[in-house]
Amino acid sequence: MPFVVAIPARFSASRLPGKPLRLLGGRPLIHRVAERALSTGAREVWVATDDVRIAEAVASLDGVHVAMTANTHLSGSDRLAECARIAGWDPEVCVVNLQGDEPFAPAAGIRAVAALLHHSNADMATLATTIDKSEDLFNPNIVKLVCNTHGEALYFSRAPIPWNRDTFATTREPTPLGPWLRHIGLYACNAGFLQRFTTMQPGTLEQIESLEQLRVLEAGHRIAVRITPEHFPPGIDTPEDLAKAEKALEDV
């Protein structure tokens, strides 16, 4: 199924300022993410940014387009809606939102989220993977989610969900067969839905959790979820994450 990849990138990340231009293996992080996108066979790859420094860094990459967007967007999806207008995509074009802090996202997983949207009746599609480490379950930078029996998201949270009332009263170790899932910050929706997203008001849940996908659920829309077999290392949110990613790159 044809799709495009769009990468929202802003310079003023609160936990890691200048994140897209931080070096990973001697190259800007945004370069590594964009090259992952190019490896998927996407019809087009775009970086949407409000910072000329990021735009100039991306300009040296063959096959990557840049959309200069407003600096007032509340979320990456809001930014990509403007990117879609700049690019002139038809409303039915499948847009994969690849976060700018996912330099190790496997190409197969990126293609899979586009396929999931195509084969589902949901308005949006995303990926998740299982959690088996307590430090991940209780880390607020790692987003958790719960799904219904139809493989659709019920809720996303920075808190450990579901909360095991009995087990967590005595230990913080998740059971090996527990239902805990880590959300992978990769979305697919069509360009028309991106425009609808911008008309939805951020709700209380989105504002409390600082999770844009909750705007979709609060507005009554559906998000299909695939439990992915591909390995997705956590994204880079902090200096510690960047150091871990550097080490992982050295170990390859």
Curated annotation (Swiss-Prot):
EC number in record: 2.7.7.38
Pfam families assigned: CTP_transf_3 (PF02348)
Disulfide bonds: none
Enzyme class: transferase
GO BP field: CMP-keto-3-deoxy-D-manno-octulosonic acid biosynthetic process; lipopolysaccharide biosynthetic process
Entry's localization field: Cytoplasm
Catalytic activity: 3-deoxy-alpha-D-manno-oct-2-ulosonate + CTP = CMP-3-deoxy-beta-D-manno-octulosonate + diphosphate
Protein family per UniProt: Belongs to the KdsB family.
HAMAP family cross-referenced by the UniProt entry: KdsB
Protein name: 3-deoxy-manno-octulosonate cytidylyltransferase
Native species: Xylella fastidiosa (strain Temecula1 / ATCC 700964)
Lineage: Bacteria, Pseudomonadati, Pseudomonadota, Gammaproteobacteria, Lysobacterales
Gene that this polypeptide is encoded by: kdsB
